[in-house]
Amino acid sequence: MNVLHVVNISFVIPYFLGKQLNWFVEKGNKEYVICSPSEELEKFSKDYVFEYKSIDVLRKISIGKDLRAVWSTYRYIKEIKADIVTGHTPKGGLIAMLAAWLARVPVRIYLRHGLVYETSHGLKRALLINIDRLASRLATKIICVSPSVARRSIEDGLNPESKQIVLAHGTCNGIDIERFSKQEANADASNALKRQFGIREGDFVIGFTGRLVRDKGIIELVRAYQEIRKLHQNVRLMLVGMLEIRDALPVDVVKTIKEDKGIISTGYVEYAIIEQYYALMDVYVLPSYREGFPTSVLEASAMEIPVITTRATGCCDSIIDGETGFFVNHDEKDLEQALQRLYDAPSLRENMGKAGRQMVVDYFRHEVVWNAIEELY
């Protein structure tokens, strides 16, 4: 079969697809990707064995450019004789589904990675909902990345329940349990990073990976850290990711991140080495306001790190409360108390870490999700 994936930026390819593409190529498929132009595309195409075409798939609405993207995608679908087209994210999904519908592709999959409208309001929210509804209408099947996204999709009238599925227990790609493993962690690399960031023996490292924006709960995380740091000078906060202009943090929080000696702000880190950073963490925190399915939580759990997260869409599916981590409210005091509880109990951290690893192995390893995709195809 000839399978085409449409994404808007190359950055997501290792997360959304990655070795899944290699796996399907070994089974006889030909894999193709449409993506906005990027220097990384050539490297990714060799790593993951796919052919690609660069087409501007913009995140923002631009009627002229969007129509050109639909036409270019349509022509590429015809050129490669695609049997299956999968569109990722609302904008990539809409362009992919419209082009595939026009080309009469028999299997058109819209992969709903989350509900981007959840934290939007007014006209913008209405527009985002209708983009999602249109992509859903043009698709023959919709994959929701988590049970909570699936439930909310029905509540918000995005599509009929009969049209959507969740792959196994969720995610779009699963987790590489061999790579994300405490036992397989590169000790030399971890020690080098500890020296680089000044992490000493006995330090308690609170970790986060992702975009440093309001939606991720970074304001609450920084303020909870400040409070617990007053009590324990060995507490460090490691923020692995970049500050962004879109949904930017307040000036005072940015100032704290840049100037607080206990905060390690790494900037951009290649996904290829992200496990080396997890290996430095004692607890992983994601106080997010919305997710599709936070794979970072599963990666941390696979590394035997206890997790603190919220009951937001997506996040609520990512831990077992009291067993692999704790749920907290979007409240810095609640988060501080959960951090204090884990700080005080090394044995609890160890037990939660082991339970988290087992959960990922049982329900979220790559092969579980890939087999579900194969059944759908």
Question: Which residues fall in each region the model found?
Answer:
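Conserved acidic donor-binding segment of nucleotide-sugar-dependent glycosyltransferases
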Residues: 321-322, 326-332, 341-346
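A conserved mid-protein helix/loop that constitutes part of the nucleotide-sugar donor-binding site
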Residues: 14-19, 204, 208-227
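Nucleotide-activated donor-binding/catalytic signature segment of Leloir-type glycosyltransferases, i.e.
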Residues: 250-269
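A short, active-site helix/loop in glycosyltransferases that binds the activated sugar's phosphate group
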Residues: 39-42, 139-179
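Short hydrophobic beta-strand element within catalytic cores of glycosyltransferases
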Residues: 306-309
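Glycosyltransferase donor-sugar binding loop
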Residues: 34-39, 171, 209, 236-249
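Aromatic "clamp/platform" in nucleotide-sugar-dependent glycosyltransferases that forms part
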Residues: 289
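Short alpha-helical donor nucleotide-sugar binding micro-motif in glycosyltransferases
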Residues: 77, 268-269, 276-281
